[in-house]
């Protein structure tokens, strides 16, 4: 018999965390007219997925672009592992190139001896390319008071952890990044080629036209790798085709080109950010007395000012939509970063 429920909440597994957190605060200098305080904290955490409930081999936290990339938890791994399909390689560690398309073959399911796909499906062939969890997080700050003036700042940092930039994936496929100028012309490394009457491309280095007067293009490239039989790849692609097909939406042919790869959309997310700066002044006590106040403090404050260092420069990952740790690991449809500057007056009575 049924109970009329469509879903239920249950403890689905066991997670082990091992970490350390510390905070320090102290005055480095103190005199009649000056006081300097420093503060800082950091935390380290390592987690391991010990087990999942019977019958569950993998817990999917986020399924991106029809399975092209996933954020998962797998027993023996860490919560937040990022997995995706990767190009196939042979026993010599060389990329295998599809003999028809000229693109890297993606490791979906099975291929025959000639390198032709037997089945395009969602087999368990995705590989770990990152993890969403930072290794170390923390910050430090300083407060310096000299007579009636003060300056206070906060710097925070995050070390390790990865983000999946879906927006960057699509923009790279559309040729919107400076790096996609590569191969677009001869100056940027593009190969010269022409296309014959059968649609086959041939290298034409130094030629002004093909044998039959064909037009010469200078946006060619040959992907590194070998064909399934071990011969070097010699298939010429145009730069536009390469970016569009390699970095488009989706992975398996039913949901994309079948040549897309998402490992390039995974970026290290280590940063040091100048979070806040306040500069202020305590008004003279005589002025506060006239206004019937015990004290009056005015300050100019700036928040989310700038990065001192960061490894991921496409977008500000802190502007991602959603506040959960999963949302913070996916850059997609985010708003622009904001820097705020304000003026405050604080009075005590």
Model regions and ranges:
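Extracytoplasmic loops and strand-loop junctions of Gram-negative outer membrane beta-barrel proteins
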Residues: 3-8, 23-25, 120-127, 257-265, ...
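Conserved small-residue
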Residues: 10-16, 20, 27-132, 163, ...
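Membrane-interface anchoring segments and C-terminal beta-barrel signals
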Residues: 214-349
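Short sequence motifs at beta-strands and strand-loop junctions characteristic
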Residues: 12-18, 76, 130-135, 264-273, ...
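Transmembrane beta-barrel strands of outer-membrane/channel proteins
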Residues: 38-44, 144, 153-157, 181, ...
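Repeated loop/turn-to-beta-strand initiation elements of outer-membrane beta-barrel proteins
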Residues: 32, 148-153, 286-287
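Hydrophobic, lipid-facing positions within transmembrane beta-strands of outer-membrane proteins
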Residues: 18-24, 38, 136-142, 149, ...
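Transmembrane beta-strands of outer-membrane beta-barrel pores
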Residues: 26-28, 42-48, 146-148, 157-161, ...
């Amino acid at each position: 018999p049924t109970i009329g429920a469509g879903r239920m909440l249950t403890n689905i597994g066991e997670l082990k965390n091992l970490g350390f957190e510390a905070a320090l605060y102290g005055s480095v200098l103190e005199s009649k007219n000056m006081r300097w305080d420093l503060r800082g904290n950091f935390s380290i955490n390592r987690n391991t997925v010990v087990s999942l409930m019977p019958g569950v081999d993998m817990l999917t936290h986020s399924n991106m672009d029809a399975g092209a990339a996933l954020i998962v938890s797998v027993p023996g791994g860490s919560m937040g592992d990022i997995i995706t399909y990767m190009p196939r390689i042979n026993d010599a560690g060389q990329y295998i190139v599809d003999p028809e398309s000229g693109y890297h073959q993606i490791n979906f399911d099975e291929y025959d001896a000639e390198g032709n796909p037997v089945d395009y499906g969602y087999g368990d062939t995705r590989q770990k390319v990152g993890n969403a969890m930072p290794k170390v997080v923390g910050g430090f700050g300083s407060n310096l008071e000299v007579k009636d003036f003060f300056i206070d700042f906060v710097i925070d940092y995050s070390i390790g952890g990865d983000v999946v930039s879906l927006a960057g994936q699509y923009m790279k496929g559309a040729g919107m990044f400076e790096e996609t100028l590569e191969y677009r012309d001869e100056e940027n490394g593009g190969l010269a080629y022409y296309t014959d009457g059968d649609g086959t491309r041939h290298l034409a280095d130094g030629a002004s036209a093909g044998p039959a007067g064909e037009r010469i293009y200078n946006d060619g490239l040959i992907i590194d790798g070998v064909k399934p039989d071990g011969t070097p790849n010699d298939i010429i692609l145009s730069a536009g085709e390469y970016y569009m097909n390699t970095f488009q939406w989706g992975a398996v042919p039913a949901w994309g080109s079948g040549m897309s790869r998402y490992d390039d959309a995974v970026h290290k997310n280590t940063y040091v950010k100048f979070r806040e700066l306040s500069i202020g002044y305590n008004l003279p006590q005589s002025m506060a007395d006239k206004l019937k106040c015990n004290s009056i403090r005015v300050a100019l404050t700036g928040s989310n000012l700038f990065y001192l260092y960061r490894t991921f420069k496409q977008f500000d990952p802190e502007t991602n939509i959603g506040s959960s740790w999963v949302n913070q690991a996916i850059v997609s449809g985010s708003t622009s970063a904001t820097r705020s500057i304000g003026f405050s007056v604080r009075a005590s009575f």
